Design a protein with these regions (language model features):
Chain A
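C-terminal motif of bacterial Sec signal peptides marking the signal peptidase cleavage site
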Residues: 2-4
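Surface-exposed, beta-sheet-biased, low-hydrophobicity segments with strongly acidic/polar composition
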Residues: 6-247
């Protein structure tokens, strides 16, 4: 009777199932919910920790990431029409996001970044550090070939300039106006999670294909978005599988 | 038959609060609605023609003819002054003669429903497959029903199982792959009966297209869903003076808005009721009701079902009716435990509420009848208390003519959501609860004249409502200079006036023609004393609405019944003032025009023998499509053909 006062059949839901932050080796868990920060991942340093066998340090490095704020303060000295906030109107409630108008620009300092990094995430956006990406048809890391040689002749896509994708300033969102960071992002790797708006509230399209990241140093890494929510269903908690592929 | 024994008979037939109603004969040909027993207006069984509180009845025959799937389909087809629109996320919002969903109390067999979205109950859970009839009382009725009975009460009375074992299967298909399947099993003996109903519906998403030049938000895709609805009701009558009923239900809906992460809605309900006829003069009823409404998101690829909302209501009710002479004394008490868990609230909240009420139905003579009621309600959260009175008078100056007058006070206690909401709506604004909200209070005056003789019936009813402290979402504001996201608070607004009248004419001829024409006028004025404008997301009531129905029913032979029906509704256009810029209210408003529209439906039903009925319909006969699919525009995209059948075994 007492239980029924506050509900029955709790068991049919997956509330609180497991721990969000415990990941296995070769897996990242990033709280990328912030609209104002990038989170950088250095895969080389993670592999070093793996090789050392320092389980605690690896767990920490795979789940704790430092936010790198997106500059939003106007900086007149910044190069015009490069780094900065780009104000766009989108026809969110009409014909959709492919209809837009540029409404303004505010120069800001460039995006700060750490000395060593491989890729970075901001909600559904991904950048690489001078790398390029190829999308495979594999949906499991185990299916991948042991050598990267089979990917060498594939077409890899480098990061490209974007001023409408990295949504930052939402203060005029209801008026369909968004402040976006002007920055290079990797459109192929970013396709692992697509933020659809309309409808309101937005929906997400999730692509669990394995992507191959070729770094500027010629290394190959396999990356796969395994999940994009926490156990309570909050979006932009990213679980990412990673693995280095030798040539 | 003495009045006392008449009362007892009615009580046993209908049960106070309409636990069961007797299933009508399986025929398109039905008797006179005036013999219908109604319970909603007085919480005691009364003949429709004699009740001092004007009660509109949507009969079982009306429901059958409408072939409606749920309450929304039915009300918008047969009731004037009713319109449904979309809230955010395409949740359905009701405007019921100037009152929104939270101010109209919707009951099933007298029991409240848990759960709400954007102020309205989930209308898809109110399936019509097991409904005997619906009683509608307009105007404030908080003296009998407590909070939320501000603008009226809609009481859905479910069927009582037939004693004879039978089964019924039905199916219907329509546009956008809309499918409906139903199963009904019932049976029993002289002392018990059981009815089981199941309904499954599904509909695909579909796109709608607006012209260029929209000045308000438009919808581009209408989201389909699929639902499952199960209900079982058992009756056991161990003696002539005692009836025990039990029920259980399960509802599931999955909206097809997102392929990856569809939203799910579930409801678990159960209850028991005992009706004990202590003597020819005394009837006691006790009931317990459980209702749990959950919302969750199904993360398909991860196979995770995460719940983000649960509203659980446990209620206990006692109702006692004592007759003396022609008079009835009614007394009752209710207790409700309300639990709300919502990830958009600051925390889990609980509230207990209790009430006591009494009513005297004094029948001076056959020409005059007076009903007076008084109720005290208590809510534990912030210790809200209300005392609400009600007075109704029926005068029958000449036979067949009833004049009814009523005054009722209504109130709506702020919900836990309205007090404690804290929801970042994807950065648009934070919807913020207000623990200091006052209860919304209304004063309703109504006057009606009803004339029914032979095959003809006419009703004219006027009403006016003065509402103070209406609870609604207010204008957006910034809590501080450093906040970048506005807050959208819940507020009390100073005043709401809703006045209007309705006129209905109905005729039935022995040749099998049944016709009904209803007109409703509603004038709704809301605002602050200082003239400050409101950013209400919902359209006010349209001033003029007209509904028309005509059908011809004919028995061609002992094996063949047929019916052809035409239903139409007209709603006048309306201009609504909406903010140009929700972030800068000072920029003023623009006028958004919602044009008049009319929708017509032609349907035909054919019963072949005892076992088969075929149903065809062409809805939106005139192929109406709104120029702009605003949230408050009718969701139709042209003519819709429907075909179905019902097999009875």
């Amino acid at each position: 009777m007492a239980a029924s006062c506050e509900g029955v059949f709790d068991g049919i839901y997956d509330e609180g199932a497991g721990s969000d932050t415990e990941v296995k080796a070769g897996q990242l868990y990033i709280d990328a919910t912030s609209w104002n920060d990038w989170y950088y991942v250095d895969l080389d340093s993670l592999l070093e920790l793996t090789d050392k066998g320092d389980v605690a340090a690896l767990q920490q490095a795979q789940t704790k990431f430092t936010p790198w704020p997106i500059p939003q303060t106007e900086n007149a000295d910044a190069a015009r029409d490069s780094s900065g906030m780009y104000i766009y109107w989108f026809d969110i409630f009409g014909k959709g996001m492919s209809y837009y108008e540029r409404r303004g620009y505010k120069p800001t300092a460039p995006q700060p970044e750490p000395e060593h990094w491989t890729f970075a995430v901001h909600r559904d956006n991904v950048r690489t550090n001078g790398g390029s990406v190829f999308e495979t048809s594999y949906t499991s890391m185990e299916e991948l070939p042991a050598s990267a040689s089979s990917f060498v002749d594939k077409t890899f896509t480098a990061d490209t300039w974007s001023e409408r994708d990295v949504w930052v300033d939402r203060t005029e969102m209801l008026n369909c106006i968004m402040g976006n960071q002007g920055i290079k992002i990797n459109q192929v790797l970013s396709s692992w999670l697509v933020f659809n708006i309309p409808p309101i509230p937005p929906t997400y399209t999730f692509n669990n294909h394995v992507f191959i990241l070729r770094t500027k140093d010629g290394e190959y890494f396999a990356l796969q978005l395994a999940n994009y929510t926490d156990s309570k269903g909050t979006t932009c908690y990213l679980t990412i599988n990673y693995r280095k592929i030798a040539l | 038959m003495s009045h006392t024994s008449l009362f007892t008979t009615l009580a046993l037939a209908a049960l106070p609060l309409g636990t069961f109603a007797v299933e009508p004969a399986d025929s398109l040909l039905t008797g006179n609605d005036l013999e219908q027993v109604v319970v909603t207006g007085t919480r005691s069984p009364k003949l429709l023609m004699e009740t001092p509180v004007l009660t509109q009845v949507i009969s079982h025959a009306d429901i059958e003819k409408a072939d409606a799937t749920n309450l929304k389909d039915l009300l918008q087809q047969v009731m004037p002054g009713v319109e449904f629109s979309f809230a955010q996320n395409q949740m359905v919002h009701l405007n019921f003669s100037g009152f929104g969903g939270q101010s109209v109390l919707i009951l099933v067999d007298g029991e409240r429903l848990a759960g709400e979205t954007m102020d309205d109950v989930d209308f898809t859970r109110l399936s019509m497959d097991n409904v005997d009839h619906i009683e509608i009382v307009k105007g404030a009725a908080s003296a009998l029903y407590g909070s939320n009975a501000n603008g009226g009460v809609i009481n859905i009375i479910t069927k009582q199982a037939a004693k004879k074992l039978n089964a019924c299967l039905d199916a219907r298909r329509a546009k956008h792959n809309e499918q409906r399947y139903g199963l009904a099993l019932q049976g029993g003996s002289s002392r018990w009966s059981n009815a089981f109903n199941m309904t499954h519906t599904t509909q695909d998403n579909y796109d709608v297209h607006s012209d260029d030049g929209a000045v308000a938000r438009t919808v581009t895709t209408i989201f389909g869903d699929h639902t499952w609805n199960f209900a079982d009701k058992a009756l056991w009558q161990p003696s002539d003076r005692l009836k025990l009923t039990g029920r259980a239900g399960y509802f599931f809906r999955q909206v097809k808005r997102s392929e990856e992460s569809p939203e799910r809605y579930r409801d678990f309900s159960a209850g028991g009721k005992a009706l004990w006829t202590l003597s020819d003069n005394d009837v006691l009823e006790g009931s317990y009701s459980f209702d749990q409404y959950d919302k969750s998101t199904w993360l398909k690829s991860q196979k995770i079902d995460t719940r983000n909302y649960s509203n659980v209501q446990n209620s206990v009710r006692l109702l006692y009716n004592h007759t003396f002479g022609d008079n009835v004394l009614t007394a009752g008490a209710d207790y409700l435990y309300d639990y709300l868990s919502n990830n958009k609230l600051d925390a889990v909240h609980r509230q207990q509420s209790a009430d006591v009420f009494a009513q005297l139905d004094w029948k001076l003579n056959r020409r005059w009848e007076f009903v007076g009621a008084l109720r005290y309600d208590y809510f534990s959260d912030h210790h809200i208390q209300r005392l609400t009175p009600k007075l109704s008078v029926r005068h029958t100056p000449v036979d067949h003519l009833n004049v009814r007058f009523g005054y009722g006070m209504g109130f709506r206690a702020p919900t836990l959501k309205e007090k404690y909401y804290d929801f970042d709506m994807i950065g648009i604004w934070t919807i913020t609860g207000n623990p200091l909200l006052k209860p919304e209070v209304s004063h309703n005056f109504n006057l009606s004249v009803e004339y029914v003789k032979g095959n003809y019936g006419f009703v004219v009813a006027g009403y006016c409502n003065r509402v103070t402290n209406k609870i609604t979402s207010g204008n957006p504001y910034y809590a501080s200079a450093t906040e970048t996201m506005p807050r959208l608070p819940y507020v009390n607004i100073d005043r709401l006036y809703v006045a209007g009248f309705e006129a209905t004419a109905r005729a039935r001829w022995s040749c099998g023609v049944d016709a009904r024409l209803s007109y409703a006028f509603v004038d709704e004025q809301a605002g602050h004393k200082d003239g400050q404008k409101l950013a209400s997301p919902y359209l006010p009531a349209r001033k003029h609405t007209l509904t028309a129905h005509a059908d011809w029913t004919h028995r061609f032979s002992t094996l063949l019944d047929g019916m052809v029906a035409l239903d139409g509704r007209f709603l006048s256009g309306i201009d609504n003032q909406e903010f140009k810029n929700y972030y800068k209210v000072e920029e003023g408003t623009i006028t958004v025009h919602y044009p008049a529209y009319t929708l017509w439906k032609l349907s035909a039903q054919m019963s072949i023998g005892k076992h088969l009925k075929l149903i065809f319909a062409v809805d939106n006969l005139l192929n109406y499509r709104p120029k702009y699919y605003y949230l408050n525009s009718p969701v139709v995209d042209g003519t819709n053909m429907m075909a179905g059948c019902k097999i009875r075994l």
